[in-house]
Design a protein with these regions (language model features):
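Mixed-charge, low-complexity intrinsically disordered regions
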Residues: 1-78
């Protein structure tokens, strides 16, 4: 499983950018969730399961997508 960088800038496979604030743990199930904020429009905050955040794009559903990761960590050169 890919490591999540807190404070990292990520690009969603559809092209929009998000800032990862933290990784949180569900109090009952123990499941990990990524807490992140969109960097456009009203800058809403979201949570998504860690497993889904680090998953690859469904190439059958999105056959023309160029980015294989659902969310890709951006380096300073991207």
């Amino acid at each position: 499983m890919r490591k999540i960088v807190k404070g990292g800038l990520y690009r969603h496979f559809k092209g929009m950018y998000y800032y990862v604030l933290d990784v949180a743990t569900h109090s009952e199930s123990g499941e990990k969730f990524v807490v992140y904020q969109k960097l456009y429009d009203n800058r809403d905050m979201y949570i998504r399961s860690l497993a889904m955040f680090v998953s690859d794009v469904d190439c059958e559903k999105y056959p023309d997508v160029e980015q294989k990761e659902r969310f890709k960590l951006m380096s300073g050169r991207d």
